[in-house]
Amino acid sequence: MSLPTEVETPTRNEWGCRCNDSSDHITIAAKFIGILHLILWILDRLFFKCIYRRLKYGPKRGPSTEGVPDSMREEYRQKQQNAADVDDGHFVNIELE
């Protein structure tokens, strides 16, 4: 019973990247999808309040207040303003003296 004395080791050119042929259709599609995903993610982060508010309420500015007394409308506006203030509250304003 003899032990193997030679070990197969890959040569340096086998360690190299085999994806140099970037004309492969799958590679091109993956790059395109990746770039598109990045652009959509950036737009979503920039405009998430506008997008989701529009999806929730449609093209109008908010839920309808038809038939609601003025006092309740004002109370609703105050709640909405307070909710917007709380939502923006995760940003820290540092004032230097």
Swiss-Prot record:
Q: Which residues lie on this side of the membrane: Intravirion?
A: 44-97
Where in the chain is the site Essential for channel activity, possibly by being protonated during channel activation, and by forming the channel gate and the selective filter? H37
Q: How is its activity regulated?
A: The M2 protein from most influenza A strains is inhibited by amantadine and rimantadine, resulting in viral uncoating incapacity. Emergence of amantadine-resistant variants is usually rapid.
The UniProt site entry described as Seems to be involved in pH gating is assigned to W41
Q: Which residues are reported to be glycosylated?
A: N20
What GO biological process terms are annotated to this protein in UniProt?
A: protein complex oligomerization; symbiont genome entry into host cell via pore formation in plasma membrane; symbiont-mediated suppression of host autophagy
Keyword Cell membrane among record annotations? no
Give residue ranges on the Virion surface side. Answer: 1-22
Q: Where is the lipid attached (S-palmitoyl cysteine)?
A: C50
The protein's topology relative to the membrane is: Single-pass type III membrane protein
**Pfam annotation, one family:** Flu_M2
Please state where this protein is localized. Virion membrane; Host apical cell membrane
Give residues where Phosphoserine occurs: S64
* Segments passing through the bilayer: 23-43
- Record region (Disordered): 58-89
Q: What else is known?
A: When the channel is activated, one or more imidazole moieties of His-37 probably become bi-protonated.
Q: How does it assemble?
A: Homotetramer; composed of two disulfide-linked dimers held together by non-covalent interactions. May interact with matrix protein 1.
Role description:
Forms a proton-selective ion channel that is necessary for the efficient release of the viral genome during virus entry. After attaching to the cell surface, the virion enters the cell by endocytosis. Acidification of the endosome triggers M2 ion channel activity.
The family assignment reads: Belongs to the influenza viruses matrix protein M2 family.
Domain notes for this protein: Cytoplasmic tail plays an important role in virion assembly and morphogenesis.
Q: What is this protein called?
A: Matrix protein 2
Q: Which organism is it from?
A: Influenza A virus (strain A/Swine/Iowa/15/1930 H1N1)
